[in-house]
Swiss-Prot record:
Pfam families: Radical_SAM, RlmN_N. It is found in: Cytoplasm. Its main location: cytoplasm. GO terms for biological process: rRNA base methylation; tRNA methylation. Its cofactor is [4Fe-4S] cluster. Belongs to the radical SAM superfamily. RlmN family. This is Dual-specificity RNA methyltransferase RlmN. Specifically methylates position 2 of adenine 2503 in 23S rRNA and position 2 of adenine 37 in tRNAs. m2A2503 modification seems to play a crucial role in the proofreading step occurring at the peptidyl transferase center and thus would serve to optimize ribosomal fidelity. InterPro entries: Aldolase_TIM, Elp3/MiaA/NifB-like_rSAM, Methyltransferase_A, RlmN_N, RNA_MTrfase_RlmN, rRNA_lsu_MTrfase_RlmN/Cfr, rSAM.
Length: 356
């Protein structure tokens, strides 16, 4: 039996090399990403011969949801099975956004963030992260990354034009799979597709300085998030072995070269671990480290998981840490850990074996 190719892996110009004329590619994109077609036979504006040809050569179901769990805060974690049987997790984070209309009335509507995985497992080996425990199995293709987002939007009846933010903060190190992640960014941004602007896509990294520079040179327009978590190389290497290859100085040099929209900032994620990196002297060092960088610090309270030796700090300590940063002019927020009760929060995702 002929192996079908994942059509979600293709940019329009690539698909145009296989399908003529080009306006048919536009129609196919719209059927898949905007009309949420279930199969090629649904694509009624295409001639019958083309629908048959597509069905004989392509599929657009690279991920299959085998389980989902909803948190009391509304977050939903999805366990996806890939074609080869490996599994990844993704999270939908619904949030309420309020605006004032022309009449001065307060209007509330849903805003969505989708946290996607870029690899099955991860080789970075961060000591606080559950994903790293199983090592790296393989990279996801661009279509497997896009497939997570498409499935979640479709399943939750989120219209294609509804604004969503994408964060590459699920399983894996996105910049260790830069080729496919950057292609996913481009596919998601297509006007005939989901039309998710690169400015709404944030790529997080544990600090691969070389790849940060490569990403910057691509000029995709994406936002950058650095998983920092420590203010000196000794502690950071203990928490994140990747620091042996790319130390803090190398990361900061790469960040300074990274092109960022004047209205945006580079996000620095700082995981607060009780008694390890949450002291006020750490906050003071962080202020010095970020001097001259347009930065926003996202403080995250450590999320416990099976086998972890670390503890979650008190909210009181986190607020003191935040207050010191803010008093020195550093934009800083404490991230609300959504999905904590279903192990969907930062550092809790993993490749789960076939349990069902």
């Amino acid at each position: 039996m002929k192996e079908l190719v994942n059509i979600l892996d293709f940019l329009p110009e690539e698909l145009g090399e296989k399908i003529k004329p080009m306006f048919r590619v536009k129609q196919i994109y719209q059927w898949i990403y905007q009309k949420y077609a279930n199969n090629f036979s649904d694509m009624s504006s295409l001639p019958k011969y083309l629908r048959l040809e597509l069905a004989q050569n392509f599929h657009f179901s690279p991920v299959k949801c085998v389980k989902n769990e909803q948190s009391k805060d509304g977050s939903i974690k999805y366990l996806f099975e890939l074609v080869d049987g490996l599994r990844v997790e993704s999270v939908l984070l619904p949030m309420k956004e309020e605006k004032i209309d022309a009449e001065g009335k307060r209007i509330s509507h849903a805003r969505y963030t989708i946290c996607v995985s870029s690899q099955v497992g991860c080789k970075s080996g961060c000591s606080f992260c559950l994903t790293a425990k199983g090592g790296l199995k393989r990279n996801l293709s661009a279509g497997e990354i896009v497939g997570q987002i498409l499935w979640i939007k479709k399943q939750n009846n989120i219209p294609y034009e509804r604004r969503v933010n994408i964060v590459y903060m699920g399983m894996g190190e996105p910049l260790d799979n830069l080729k496919n992640v950057s292609k996913a960014v481009k596919i998601l941004a297509q006007n005939d597709g989901l039309a998710i602007s690169p400015r709404r896509q944030t790529i997080s990294t544990s600090g691969l300085a070389k790849q940060i520079k490569e990403l910057g040179q691509m000029n995709l327009g994406v936002l950058l998030a650095i998983s920092l978590h420590a203010v000196n190389d000794g502690l950071r290497t203990e928490l994140m072995p990747i620091n042996k290859a790319y130390n803090i100085a190398a990361i900061m040099d790469a960040v300074r070269e990274f092109p960022i929209d004047q209205r945006k900032r580079v996000m620095f994620e700082y995981l607060l671990i009780d008694g390890i990196n949450d002291k006020l002297e750490h906050a003071k060092e962080l202020v010095k480290l970020l001097n001259g960088i347009k930065a926003k610090v996202n403080l995250i309270l450590f999320n416990p998981h099976e086998g972890s030796l670390y503890k979650r700090p008190s909210l009181e300590n986190a607020i003191k840490f935040q207050d010191l940063l803010s008093s020195k002019g550093v934009t800083c927020t404490i991230r609300e850990s959504k999905g904590l009760d279903i192990s969907a929060a930062c550092g809790q995702l993993k490749e789960r074996a076939k349990e069902q």
